[in-house]
Amino acid sequence: TKVIPEIDAYRYSTIAAACIKAKTASGGYVPAEDTILQKLYYDIATVQEIVGDNTPLVITISRMVAAILSMSDKLSKKLDVTDFKQGDVSFKVKSLDGQHPLISVGSERMKTEYLFKDGKTSGQEDGGFAATASSKNINWIITPRKAPVAVSKTDKMRIFDPETNQKARAYAMDYRKYHDIWIPDQQIKTCFTNVKEELS
């Protein structure tokens, strides 16, 4: 319950930071019902200008922004339900015009910058993560399906028998799991991030 939000926050903020650095991001747009569709289509067109029409795109969108689309009678007509496969898991998501899957993510995980607490430094003993004071709100991130490469590695698992485990008379396991996201330099220009606040 704690790990997945932290991984999401790290990955989305990493993509956003790369887009901002590469100038494939726009800022200063506060989502509103009368302009959101036009803005979204324009950003999709910006990506398609580079990758072409046949490259599948995924739109990772803030849940509060997605709600504007879903709650509007006019805008919701543009949304269809489609199957989205991620690894071996297939699930149903809303998509724009039946083409571009909309992956809705909690707003607290859609910021441009976080402090990831190491659990050791003074003031960081509780671990976890928090948005920094200078972080901005991400409206959406548009990426080709294969541009960001999410990777994870599991370190050697240790198993403790009940005689060794001092916390309970039961077996215990521990392991380290490492996560990262890679975006090859030539692929950054194929991604686009839309941010609520102005970009400096």
Residue ranges and their predicted role:
Residues 12-89:
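Extended, solvent-exposed, turn-rich assembly/linker loops in the middle of proteins
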Residues 28-34, 71-200:
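Sequence/fold signature of self-assembling virion shell proteins
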Residues 1-21, 49-61, 161-183:
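Long, contiguous amphipathic alpha-helices that act as assembly "spine/axial" helices in icosahedral shell
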